[in-house]
Curated annotation (Swiss-Prot):
Signal sequence, start to end: none
Protein name: Ribosomal RNA large subunit methyltransferase F
GO molecular function: 23S rRNA (adenine(1618)-N(6))-methyltransferase activity
Native species: Bacteroides fragilis (strain ATCC 25285 / DSM 2151 / CCUG 4856 / JCM 11019 / LMG 10263 / NCTC 9343 / Onslow / VPI 2553 / EN-2)
Keyword terms: Cytoplasm, Methyltransferase, rRNA processing, S-adenosyl-L-methionine, Transferase
Described function: Specifically methylates the adenine in position 1618 of 23S rRNA.
């Protein structure tokens, strides 16, 4: 699991993790190092403490983030996959970026300041961290969970490089996405979102159990399940499809406030109905961008007016 094939060309995490570098930068990672079934150095990716330590090491080593932490039972995101979304968004809003660029800010043409809105920033604040450190973008991150907003704000204030570059806003109405967050005269070059894709806690738990059982090659019980992510991060009424329908509907009211609207779509079966909805919404253009991470394929749905 240490190998991540077919990530974006500018993704710093292509190939295998350099555990020698990572443990030197963050020594607490050492106690989680194991040899996997192939005899190579790795960690137990089913151990949330190990994954959290790996994230801290990656953020220190590759992004210069000296402080990063999340509350217990909150989502601990895989950084390589999150970075891919940012790099593909960069291709969308900065089409002059060369495929030979290394991912360093100095290698990326950036003649003006790009401003981004992360819907559901989470306690981890990972998209703004990567977007700011890689491309110099500024961010507004919104969330309906006060604990997530407070934790993300602490991450920002504890890292001087992020200060005044990332703003956090609490969404006080869980039924709304852009309303109450985007001010009338405000403009964003792009919006990002990793929506909750399950429609209930039970569905979320069952989905995770199936995934872990498949990966481990044996049945995993709920007693063994370490369920990373709270309710707001993992499920909402109507699931991913209903959430994105609401986003598309609301985006019409903010067509002059945003250059591109984007979201991850985890369930391929939702794409047909979502694109049909977009075509009936008088948009100028929509795109489906595929991202490949080993055997996993995920998709970004993007549209503009």
């Amino acid at each position: 699991m240490a190998e991540r094939n077919e990530l974006h060309k500018r993704n710093r995490h292509n190939g295998q993790y350099d555990f020698s570098r990572l443990t030197e930068e963050y020594p607490p990672l050492k106690k989680f190092i194991v040899l996997n079934a192939y005899g190579t150095t790795s960690i137990d990716f089913f151990n949330p403490r190990a994954v959290k330590a790996l994230n801290k090491a990656l953020l220190i080593s590759y992004y210069g983030i000296r402080y990063w932490d999340i509350p217990k039972n909150y989502l601990c995101p895989p950084i390589p996959g999150r970075a891919d979304y940012i790099h593909y968004i960069a291709d969308l809003i900065q089409p002059d970026i060369s495929d030979e660029s290394t991912g360093l800010k100095t290698a990326v043409p950036n003649t003006r300041q790009y401003r981004c809105l992360d819907i559901g920033v989470g306690a981890n604040c990972i998209y703004p961290i990567i977007g700011q450190t890689e491309y110099g973008w500024t961010f507004v991150g919104s969330d309906i969970d006060p604990v997530s907003i407070d934790n993300a704000r602490k991450i920002v204030t504890c890292n001087p490089a992020l200060a005044h570059k990332i703003e956090l806003r609490l969404q006080r109405d869980s039924r709304k996405i852009f309303e109450g967050i985007i001010a009338p005269n405000e403009y964003f070059d792009v919006t990002l979102c990793n929506p909750p894709f399950h429609s209930s806690k039970e569905e979320a738990e069952d989905g995770t159990l199936r995934k872990l059982s498949s990966l481990k090659g044996k049945k995993v019980t709920k007693a063994q399940l370490n369920f990373g992510g709270n309710a707001n991060e993992l499920w909402c009424e109507g699931g991913e499809f209903r959430f994105l329908l609401t986003m598309i509907e609301e985006s019409r009211n903010y067509r002059k406030n945003c250059g591109w609207f984007t979201s991850l779509v985890s369930k391929e079966k939702n794409l047909g109905k979502l694109t049909a909805k977009l075509k009936s919404t008088d948009i100028a253009e929509h795109r489906i961008i595929e991202m490949h991470q080993g055997t996993k394929t995920s998709r970004i749905l993007a549209w503009r007016f």
